[in-house]
Amino acid sequence: MAGVSSESLSAALASLETKLAHASLELSAELFGTVDVLDGNAGLRRALTDPARGASDKAGLVAQLLHGKVSAEAESTVASLATSRWSSARDIGDALETVAATVAIAVAERQGGSAGLERLEEDLFAFIRVVGSSHDLQRALDDSKATAEAKGALALKLVPNASDASALLIRQAVASPRGLKPVALLERFVELVAKRQDRWIAQVSVTRDLTAEQTARLQAGLNNLYGRDLKINVEIDPALVGGIRIKVGDEVVDATVATRVAELRRQLAS
């Protein structure tokens, strides 16, 4: 996904972030179910991504499709995606799949913090390893004659201790891999988990080692700012000249001398 579709997905994920504190696995399942509906109706995908249609028209189509069948939160999430811009009709389904998986991952995070994300990742990797080492299992999960329910039941037998979030993502991958092998789709989900884990790590760049007191103050300040216990990784970079650069997830705080000098040079050159 690239261009305008990538921008629309980024905006959707940013908007979703404000709602994840109350999100549920039920919401994730509803969104995954809507992905299946979109995949089965090319005309609907084209209608929802047609740039000639107005936002209210698209929202109306979503209401006709989903109202009373899913939660209001699921309906509004799909409507928001429908009123965004997409490079191709398929991209809206891909984006909704990413949003649905992100909801499930965030639920695991809310329930267990960083440890919850680690367990989710371990569950998914365990399934990937088991299936990847067995041609018989791969054939069984690829069998077009087998029902989604049968594939899901088989998959969960392979990871009997999987968390609820893990089970949801695994079932989705085997029941609706959307043109991929189930393992390949789960690997994409693992990438989303890893990106979520980055929110628990502060990458700190400084010109020299921090003292124990400085590290403790930095730890306390970052934990207070982000509302969670972050792991701090310190990198020594003499090129920064002075100051500090902190990266947590996609957020970067750059208070280095090198950056300030570069900005001054840009201003003088303009």
Protein language model regions, located:
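Elongated, mostly alpha-helical coiled-coil "stalk/stator" tethers of large membrane protein machines
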Residues: M1-R245, E251, A255-S270
